[in-house]
Regions:
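Terminal targeting and flexible regions in eukaryotic proteins, enriched
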Residues: 1-64
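Concave beta-strand-loop units of leucine-rich repeat
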Residues: 31-32, 47-68, 75-149
Length: 150
């Protein structure tokens, strides 16, 4: 299945490369592993994926922002962004791969007003966020119109 065991991957230092290996292991596991193996190891890998934050993003969200299906899209439930770089988040909001998100956290206070506006417009215009139960937009400077759109 993989050259490294899941135990080795989970004990690796956090970072994008480690997450890429975990995601690759999960994709292979979904395709190849017997159900007993998945029952033991996949929940731990999913917990790592569910709690991973954007500051470790060096590639782990790659593919989730595509218009084509990502094999792990149904498993992605929570995403936290440390910044609101429109070039990074707007394709993410437009992708159907985020339809399973239940929690979305943003920290936007370091961005300029124009960047915030673009991010908020993309968020408000996304047709894929209907399952959100928690939305945090710290520092977004929401207006009454923004709240009405959300």
């Amino acid at each position: 299945m993989s050259t490294a065991s899941l135990e080795e991957l989970l004990s690796a230092a956090p970072g994008g490369a480690a997450m890429e290996r975990i995601v690759a292991w999960m994709v292979a596991a979904l395709a190849e592993a017997p159900a007993a193996t998945l029952a033991v190891h996949l929940p731990r890998a999913l917990a790592v994926l569910a709690g991973w934050e954007d500051r470790h993003r060096e590639g782990w969200l790659e593919g989730f922002d595509a218009p084509t299906p990502h094999p792990l899209a149904p498993l992605l439930r929570r995403v936290s962004f440390d910044d609101g770089d429109p070039d990074y988040v707007l394709p993410f909001f437009a992708s159907p791969n985020i339809t399973h998100l239940t929690e979305l956290d943003f920290f936007l206070s370091g961005e300029g007003d124009e960047s915030k506006r673009r991010v908020l417009d993309g968020l408000c215009g996304s047709p894929h966020l209907g399952r959100l139960t928690s939305l945090s937009l710290v520092g977004a400077g929401l207006t009454d119109d923004d709240l009405a759109r959300l």
